[in-house]
Curated annotation (Swiss-Prot):
The keyword Transmembrane helix is annotated on this UniProt entry: no
Name of the protein in question: Small ribosomal subunit protein bS6
Keywords: Ribonucleoprotein, Ribosomal protein, RNA-binding, rRNA-binding
Entry's Gene Ontology molecular function annotations: small ribosomal subunit rRNA binding; structural constituent of ribosome
Gene3D superfamilies (alphabetical): 3.30.70.60
KW Nucleotide-binding (keyword) present: no
Recorded name of the encoding gene: rpsF
Matches recorded under InterPro entries: Ribosomal_bS6, Ribosomal_bS6_sf, Ribosomal_S6_plastid/chlpt, Transl_elong_EF1B/ribsomal_bS6
Length: 127
């Protein structure tokens, strides 16, 4: 089994419950293809670098998992047909250095999940 990271962006028009349901759907696909989900990093609502499907913002989520090559095709097929997902990217970690970095990312994602959420900081604006 190889190490993979999939980042996907969900439409910003969804409610929190709908967004959580879409993320759960993708996690269910991982379970169906016998992928081992190691960590999830919910990055939250962010501004996109450029408009995608007339959206300037999106809800980012990163999944770290181990799976075989055939599973990736099914995961990406489900991401393509999901109308709520506006963009996605899957990265395969192959070399030892890449796998070491993958392990660090998984540890950081699990650590941030265990830590209590910090209060959002107020944005500063210059006059």
């Amino acid at each position: 089994m190889n190490c993979y990271e999939t980042l996907f962006v969900v439409k910003p028009t969804l409610t929190e419950e709908e967004t959580a349901a879409e993320i759960a759907k993708i996690k269910d696909v991982l379970a169906k293809v016998d992928a081992e989900l190691l960590a999830t990093d919910d990055m939250g609502m962010r501004k996109l670098a450029y408009p995608v499907q007339k959206n300037d913002r999106g809800y980012y989520t990163v999944l770290f998992y181990k799976a075989n090559g055939e599973a990736i095709a099914e995961i990406e097929r489900n991401l393509k047909i999901n109308e709520e997902v506006i963009k996605f990217l899957t990265v395969k970690y192959v070399k030892n250095k890449e796998i070491a970095q993958f392990d660090k990312l998984v540890a950081a994602a699990n650590k941030s999940k265990d830590a209590e959420p910090a209060e959002p900081k107020a944005e500063t604006t210059e006059a």
